[in-house]
Swiss-Prot record:
Keywords: Cytoplasm, Hydrolase. GO terms for molecular function: peptidyl-tRNA hydrolase activity. Pfam families: PTH2. This is Peptidyl-tRNA hydrolase. The keyword Transcription regulation does not apply. GO terms for cellular component: cytosol. It comes from Methanococcus aeolicus (strain ATCC BAA-1280 / DSM 17508 / OCM 812 / Nankai-3). The natural substrate for this enzyme may be peptidyl-tRNAs which drop off the ribosome during protein synthesis. PANTHER family: PEPTIDYL-TRNA HYDROLASE 2, PEPTIDYL-TRNA HYDROLASE 2, MITOCHONDRIAL. The keyword 4Fe-4S does not apply. Belongs to the PTH2 family. GO terms for biological process: translation. Its EC number is 3.1.1.29.
Length: 116
């Protein structure tokens, strides 16, 4: 089974709408990266129902660590930075999207994180 993981910063205290928007950016960009780099995985994930899991980190440092680990392990991923139009300053790192990819592979990086 395939899934996509979206990681959001809990320390920023973003409103619900802002959280959803940042997570949506991460989901879409990460999917597009997967579709470009590994189209068979993207297609399989679409056919399986697009499973997603949303997790949280408590700092920018933690977010960067997860992003670094995903890159090192060769996952299609993205780091989202806010445009600064509403609640938080421009350039603030808010979210990471990873995959889709095999669930068991993603667990090695994200298994220690808690659900949002």
């Amino acid at each position: 089974m395939y899934k996509q993981v979206i990681i959001l910063r809990n320390d920023l205290k973003m409103g619900k709408g802002k959280l959803v928007a940042q997570g949506s950016h991460a989901s879409l960009i990460s999917f597009l990266n997967t579709q470009k780099n590994n189209p068979s995985v993207a297609k399989e994930w679409l056919n399986e129902g697009q499973k997603k899991v949303v997790l949280k980190v408590n700092s920018e440092k933690e977010l960067f660590e997860v992003f670094r680990d995903a890159n090192i392990d060769g996952f299609s991923c993205c780091l989202i930075r806010d445009a600064g139009h509403t609640q938080i300053p421009s350039g603030t790192a808010t979210a990471v999207g990873i995959g889709p990819d095999k669930e068991e592979k993603l667990e090695k990086i994200t298994g220690k994180l808690k659900l949002l």
